[in-house]
């Protein structure tokens, strides 16, 4: 029985961390954050509330990251700044410079939750959670591209290999350019232990 996480992307959620968008997205500039012309912070807040309600109704406990007017608009996407294993969390380093400070929020939250931190990706390495996919409990695929580089993959491998976890790097297609930011999870969505929804034309 794991104490801190699950090395699976198909099992039911039991505990998650989330952040409210109300304050952090209120003043977000569309062009700066690449949100597109249809971005509406009020609507984003409403939709996030519905999403959080669905997560809670699924039976998962939600721990809320400290709220604040810190301008970290993307911090509501809590999957990216850290990776949780059965033994604890790994603090990642964001490839999008506007998101670098989000990792400290995750570190603070894990400390409050008594979740141990196994390591941290340091410069010049970058790894974002959206580029990490658990193939099985002992295999982590990591997409190398705009937001995750080889130095980050090497550091992540050094942290996880002592736990018996193989880290497999793969090249991601650029597709529509760097600003579009294609993550590995944009291509692969695990549905069950032996089933995934994939976009074959872009599959590494």
Name the predicted role of every residue range.
Residues 1-204:
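The feature marks the mature, well-folded catalytic cores of soluble enzymes
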